[in-house]
Amino acid sequence: EGNPSTTSDPTDGSGAWFWWSKEGTKVYKQLWNRLQDKLQDEYGLHNLIYEENLYAWSDSSAEWYVGDDRTDLVAYDKYNTQYNRHDGKTSGPNLDAETGIFYKLNGYVNGTKMVAMAENDYISSMSNMLVEHAYWLYFCPWYDSANALFVSGENYQDHDEMKALYNSDFCITLDELPADLFNHGDQPTTTTTTTSGTTTT
């Protein structure tokens, strides 16, 4: 009870492959707002972190953004081991940091929200993310299945690069979290964080 939980429903708005986005941005935003209001006002769920999945396919992609007051994070689903690569290859691990997409999403929110990689096939290399300043909040490889081994398969991951990322100071792993993480009371410290800095209020 009270533990934070991330939700991204309705997801993939601008993808238009789900029923909730086929009617366009207006209907999608109405559904997002209605669901959020119901979860908070009717069910009393105030521990949810709202994450909106966005894309960067065209100039109109930003129109799907639900607004600063309606989401806490923005995220991107990335699957491009086999296509849309920048290295000319069509298979094998793709270590690209997807910097262009990171900064497009950052621009949609004017630097006011953190940007995550909500789903992905490969994990970007640590060196590429650092050099290109693509500071994804987190990454979440799709699980292994009979169809694709997204985590353990060598066609998707460079396991040496994966180990380097997990062992770097840049990456926070579960064992590095405070043991008393959820025992600091009900009143959080209020801060405003943007790409230009953090202010405590």
Predicted regions located by residue number:
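Aromatic- and acid-rich polysaccharide-binding/catalytic face
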Residues: 61-92, 140-144
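Alpha-helical scaffolding within the catalytic cores
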Residues: 54-66, 96-105, 121-129
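Acidic, His- and aromatic-enriched active-site or binding-groove loops in soluble protein domains
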Residues: 14-47, 75-81, 140-143
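Substrate-binding cleft of secreted/luminal carbohydrate-active enzymes
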Residues: 112-188
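Active-site groove signature of glycoside hydrolases
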Residues: 1-22, 50-53, 69, 73-74, ...
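Active-site clefts of carbohydrate-active enzymes
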Residues: 2-8, 78-82, 102-130, 134-135
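Aromatic-lined carbohydrate-recognition surfaces of secreted/lumenal glycan-active proteins
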Residues: 1, 32-61, 112-123
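Extracellular mucin-like PTS domains
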Residues: 189-201
